[in-house]
A protein has these predicted regions:
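Preference for intrinsically disordered or flexible, low-complexity segments
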Residues: 1-268
Length: 268
């Protein structure tokens, strides 16, 4: 006997409760100017007095897609309490720095962390360094978007690589009609799950990811923490054709503020 819709809804509620994670959602807005240390998508970065903008092997500057000022986030257990985290990708590359063979490679992306940002270069000094050569980026070069953060809790998304395993185990514990994968379910049941489960299609820090294609991680991947997700908005941000970018990190590395090994992916 097939489970009823009410029984399936109860199962999804149980799964959601069992997989709750903290997530910080991000809304953007256009502004005239932001401080160099403000949270932002795009725009001009904070650069220490003795620092330099990251560059590729030919000496061309990377493009900063995001800067997060940790002190501007709501109280959370995801990010460091203080400092600036910057996300950079290579300019002038059709894949926006994505390495399909080694998504943790830093050849096409960099994550920089400044635990105690002191007085840095002035805007004029930053502009002298930050001159993009190709301007082939997912955002209009130099245009900046201010960020507003909201914290909540949310269960696993349908896109997450571990969803099928978690859901299948819970289904088989609950119902006599056993399955090996979610794809063993009737189409109408899968459609109902799509309506009930969080999609995660938004800019976010933490929580579970969203993909337009599929999760690049293997099951039980050590890259469990969603450091940042940037969605396309059709207006100011465009990853390919309405795609989404994700940056994942090992939980221990995040706790130790070690951002050398971050898994970067985007798809559309």
């Amino acid at each position: 006997m097939e489970p009823t819709q009410e029984q399936i809804k109860a199962l999804v509620a149980k799964l959601n409760e069992a997989t709750l994670k903290e997530v910080i959602t991000i809304e953007t807005r256009e502004v005239e100017s932001l401080a160099l240390t403000d949270s932002k998508f795009g725009g001009y970065p904070y650069v220490p007095k003795d620092g330099r903008i990251p560059r590729d092997s030919e000496g061309n500057p990377f493009f900063m897609v995001a800067q997060i000022n940790c002190e501007q986030l709501p109280e959370n257990s995801i990010y460091p309490k203080k400092g600036l985290l910057q996300f950079w990708i290579i300019d002038g590359d059709d894949l926006f720095g994505l390495d399909l063979q080694n998504p943790c490679s830093n050849a096409g992306k960099r994550i920089l962390y400044f635990p105690k940002p002191t007085d840095g270069l002035s805007l004029d000094e930053v502009k002298l360094q930050y001159v993009l050569t190709e301007e082939y980026t997912p955002m209009t070069p130099y245009k900046e978007l201010a960020l507003t953060f909201t914290k909540r809790e949310e269960g696993i998304t349908l896109s997450d690589v571990n969803f099928d395993r978690f859901f299948t185990d819970m289904w088989n514990e609950t119902f006599s009609d056993k399955i090996e994968t979610i794809w063993d379910l009737p189409q109408e049941t899968r459609e109902l799950l799509g309506e009930l489960l969080p999609e995660g299609a938004e800019h976010r820090i933490g929580g579970y990811p969203y993909f337009t294609q599929q999760d690049p991680r293997e099951e039980d991947s050590p890259f469990t923490e969603l450091l940042l997700q940037m969605d396309s908005d059709g207006d100011h941000i465009m990853w390919g054709t309405m795609g989404v970018a994700n940056f994942f990190i090992n939980k221990k590395d995040l706790q130790n503020c070690n951002f050398e090994e971050v898994l970067y992916n985007w798809d559309c």
